[in-house]
């Protein structure tokens, strides 16, 4: 019992030390390094990542005028990332809260997402995007996972509300994504993993 108490005290002290270290992290420098690394990796994949600057915010950093171009083009006025220390320790994997303002995705025609965000948990076998939300012409609510080795959707349960002008595009996307239509302008991205197996 005495050994358990000592171990618990040590864990509390360690958690306090990490929290203090986290509070004084030079987030602007961390963000600048992370974005430079991301831009380099995107370039090797045939994509271009540009931004105008990085600022520190409480618990993370914010990137201004972000554009990611390739097969499609994603742009937003600002992208804010706040890594979660305690959540990462609990999940034994990196966890980060992501939010953006005035986001849009161009894929044939622009999709205006407005403001939104999600929480991402990145494990070696699965990247989870939960709490997906947007408030623009294209509204998304739900979650999905990506299998890094296959770069395919593993599990998903997300509602998508789209304007009438984009319905034809959704029908096309239906050939590549697990989309189900449930009324005018209302779609669901759904995929469940078979028990003990891999999602199809």
Language-model features: where?
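Hydrophobic membrane-insertion alpha-helices, especially the h-region
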Residues: 7-24
